[in-house]
């Protein structure tokens, strides 16, 4: 089963407006972006003593016709009493995320002017090629596909 973009938009909008996602994740911030439709989430980085946060973007892969998870890990440091956030190095990112073996992480870049400027740039992406095998391919649950996808692809970030 593949997801059509219109189905993705409908399910993502429902997910963003419901409180279910916020019960499952310790969200610091969330924004539903409408064009192109994506959900921008910020969660605390609970694996590092130095603080920081993890930035998540749920968007749509038109190639695979599946949801796509993009991730950036930010480290917070203090210099002369002023806190700053900067992108974590790849080794720190890998250690922070503790990626399950069934997921493949790669480097991706958003350069599309349709996305807000703050979302453009380098991201790690969880490759969507095996999504159907991981989430399930049952047509009878098509209307809740994104809910199942979130439970597999998103909740491990906050463990």
From Swiss-Prot:
Keywords: Autophagy, Membrane, Protein transport, Transferase, Transport, Ubl conjugation pathway. It holds the Pfam family Autophagy_act_C. GO terms for biological process: autophagy of mitochondrion; cytoplasm to vacuole targeting by the Cvt pathway; piecemeal microautophagy of the nucleus; protein modification by small protein conjugation. It is found in: Preautophagosomal structure membrane. It is a peripheral membrane protein. It is an enzyme of class 2 (transferase). Its EC number is 2.3.2.-. InterPro entries: Atg10 (IPR016524), Atg3/Atg10 (IPR007135). The active site is at residue 129. One of its GO terms (molecular function) is Atg12 transferase activity. GO terms for cellular component: phagophore assembly site membrane. Belongs to the ATG10 family. Forms homooligomers. E2-like enzyme required for the cytoplasm to vacuole transport (Cvt), autophagy and nucleophagy. Acts as an E2-like enzyme that catalyzes the conjugation of ATG12 to ATG5. ATG12 conjugation to ATG5 is required for proper localization of ATG8 to the preautophagosomal structure (PAS). Likely serves as an ATG5-recognition molecule. This is Ubiquitin-like-conjugating enzyme ATG10. It comes from Candida glabrata (strain ATCC 2001 / BCRC 20586 / JCM 3761 / NBRC 0622 / NRRL Y-65 / CBS 138) (Yeast).
